[in-house]
Curated annotation (Swiss-Prot):
Keyword Ribosomal protein (UniProt): yes
Gene3D superfamilies to which the protein is assigned, alphabetical: Ribosomal protein L31 (4.10.830.30)
Gene that this sequence comes from: rpmE
Species classification: Bacteria, Pseudomonadati, Pseudomonadota, Alphaproteobacteria, Hyphomicrobiales
Entry-linked SUPFAM superfamilies: L28p-like
Name of the molecule in the record: Large ribosomal subunit protein bL31
Organism: Rhodopseudomonas palustris (strain BisB18)
HAMAP family for this protein: Ribosomal_bL31_1 (MF_00501)
InterPro entries: Ribosomal_bL28/bL31-like_sf, Ribosomal_bL31, Ribosomal_bL31_A, Ribosomal_bL31_sf
One GO cellular component term: ribosome
Amino acid sequence: MKAEIHPNYHSITVVMTDGTEYVTRSTWGNEGDKLNLDIDSKSHPAWTGGQQQMLDRGGRVSRFQKKFSGFLKKD
């Protein structure tokens, strides 16, 4: 096996959408970095039963809704 081909595995702090933090080990970033989550299990509709709204990243959802707004409407 080749030496030094594995990524650096270190501790980081993950910040949830509600501000809670926990420390885990990851290959992301550098030792001690903070990873701020945009969506997590406390804010994603799949885990909240649809009570939270998804963020519209880059207007994708609004463009889709505009494009197909009258698609299934019955007169």
